[in-house]
Amino acid sequence: LVGSEMCIRDRGRLSVSKGLDTLRFVFNNQRWMYASRKNQLVNEGAVPLLLRQKHWMEVDDEKTASPVPSPDGKWIAFIKNQNIYVKEVATGKEKQLSLDGTLGNYYSAYIRWSPDSKKVASCKIRPVEKRYVYYVESSPADQLQPKLHKQEYAKPGDELPFKVPCIYEVESGRSIIPSTELFDRQYEVYGPEWNPDSRAVTFEYNQRGHQVYRVLELSAETGKVRPLVEETSDTYVNYTRHFRHDLKDGKQMIWMSERDNWNHLYMYNRITAQPDYQITKGEW
C-alpha cells in the first residue's frame, strides 16, 4: 500500500500524538487510528464530503463553507444568493455587502476577515462548464461486466474558472474591486490572505502555461495590485514545489525559488518587493 497513488496522496493527512503512542491518518477517504501500545488499528469513520481529497484536476467551486465569525466576535460573514452578507451578532441584523453576485459570477464562500474585523475579502468567481475524460475498467472486482468511469479533467485549450480577489468594508459597504491585468491569464489564483496590519491582502497567481508565477498584494486602501515576487521561465515554473512563509511582522517573507537553477530559500522584503538576502545556497 505504501507505494500506491492513494497512499501518497493522503500521506500529508497524518498526525502523531504528543505521547508518540497514537497515529491518525486518512486512507481511501476513511479516518484511521493506530494505538501502538495496544497494537490496534481502528476505523474512525468516513471523512466528511467537504474534507475529502479530490483528484488534482477537480475544481473546487467554493460554494459551500460555514459562516465565518469576525476576530472580535461581533460579526458573522456568509454567502446568500451568491453575494456576501454579514450579520451583527448582538442584534441579528443582516447587511448585504456585495450586490453583483450571480450564478454565472458569484462570490466564494471562503471569506476571510481582516485582523481588525473591519473588512472581508473573498474571490468573485466566473465558473466554466466542467470537462471530463472517460476510461473503462475492464475487470472490476465486484462484477463481470466492465465499468465506465469519468474524471473531471480540463484539457489544453479548455476554458478555466476566473477569480478576482475583492475586499468589502463592513461599516461603509465600500468595495475594492481590482484591475486584473497582473493576473488575467489564470491557471489558478490562490488566496487571498490578509496582511497583519489589515491594509492589504496577498494572493498568488499561477499563469496558464506555467511560465509566470506571481505573489501579488491588493491594497485595501487604494485598490491597486502590486507584485511582491515574480518568477518567470522559458520552460516551466515548478508551482507544485514552491514554499512561502509570511513573517508575523508583515514586512518580510520566506520564498522558495529556482531562479539560480537550484531550489533555494530567499528572505524577501515585502515593502521593497526585493529579496533582502538568500538564505540557502549551493548546488543542491
Where are these regions (language model features)?
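Beta-propeller folds
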Residues: S4-W284
